[in-house]
């Protein structure tokens, strides 16, 4: 038996859950919720009173954090909803490849090469222009439910 047969690559999340349960009645505006299997930021919450047949209901209006699409859901306030683990991480921009991927420097000195340029036109222009001008840029990357996307940019001065 060689050592190679027992070697495996560890994954970043190590099997951790992508969501956690939270009672619908406790989710507030600007919190996060999973609607139709998409991570969303809540923009509006309204609750209806208990009626003759059952529970008070929460009506959520939310925006998908990656696509910007508006989604809605109605859930009994006593039921649990899935809430995504949403993380924001800052990485320094090293390079932009010709096929639309960015090369980022992680905190531990490794490079991260699996992220595409942002789809938002304003952000895309800021990244490309800043990089072309030779500025030192830090990109904010939002990750939730196995997806990642560049969502912000900071200029930390000239190189």
UniProtKB/Swiss-Prot annotation:
Protein name: Eukaryotic translation initiation factor 5A-5
SMART domains for the chain: eIF-5a
Any one Gene Ontology molecular-function term assigned to this protein's record: RNA binding
Matching InterPro entries: IF5A-like, IF5A-like_N, NA-bd_OB-fold, Rib_uL2_dom2, Trans_elong_IF5A_hypusine_site, Transl_elong_IF5A_C, Translation_prot_SH3-like_sf
Regions of compositional bias (Basic and acidic residues) in chain numbering: 1-12
Stretch list, region Disordered: 1-23
Entry function: Translation factor that promotes translation elongation and termination, particularly upon ribosome stalling at specific amino acid sequence contexts. Binds between the exit (E) and peptidyl (P) site of the ribosome and promotes rescue of stalled ribosome: specifically required for efficient translation of polyproline-containing peptides as well as other motifs that stall the ribosome. Acts as a ribosome quality control (RQC) cofactor by joining the RQC complex to facilitate peptidyl transfer during CAT tailing step.
CDD domains per UniProt: S1_eIF5A (cd04468)
Residues the record lists as Hypusine modifications: 52
SUPFAM superfamilies in the record: Nucleic acid-binding proteins, Translation proteins SH3-like domain
Pfam families: eIF-5a (PF01287), IF5A-like_N (PF21485)
UniProt record similarity statement: Belongs to the eIF-5A family.
Modification note: Lys-52 undergoes hypusination, a unique post-translational modification that consists in the addition of a butylamino group from spermidine to lysine side chain, leading to the formation of the unusual amino acid hypusine. eIF-5As are the only known proteins to undergo this modification, which is essential for their function.
Swiss-Prot/TrEMBL keywords: Hypusine, Initiation factor, Protein biosynthesis
Keyword field contains Protein biosynthesis: yes
GO biological process: positive regulation of translational elongation; positive regulation of translational termination; translational elongation
């Amino acid at each position: 038996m060689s050592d190679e047969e027992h070697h495996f690559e560890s994954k970043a999340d190590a099997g951790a859950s992508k969501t956690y349960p939270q009672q619908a009645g406790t989710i507030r505006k600007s919190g996060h919720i999973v609607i139709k299997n998409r991570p969303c930021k809540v923009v509006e919450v309204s609750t209806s009173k208990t009626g003759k047949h059952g529970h008070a209901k929460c009506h959520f209006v939310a925006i998908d954090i990656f696509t910007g699409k508006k989604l809605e859901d109605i859930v009994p306030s006593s039921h649990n909803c899935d809430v995504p683990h949403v993380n924001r991480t800052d990485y320094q921009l090293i390079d932009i490849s010709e096929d639309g991927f960015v090369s980022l420097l992680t905190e531990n000195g490794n490079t991260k090469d699996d992220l595409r340029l942002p789809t938002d036109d304003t952000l895309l222009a800021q990244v490309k222009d800043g990089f072309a001008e030779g500025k030192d840029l830090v990109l904010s990357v939002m990750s939730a439910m196995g997806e990642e996307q560049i969502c912000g940019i900071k200029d930390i001065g000239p190189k």
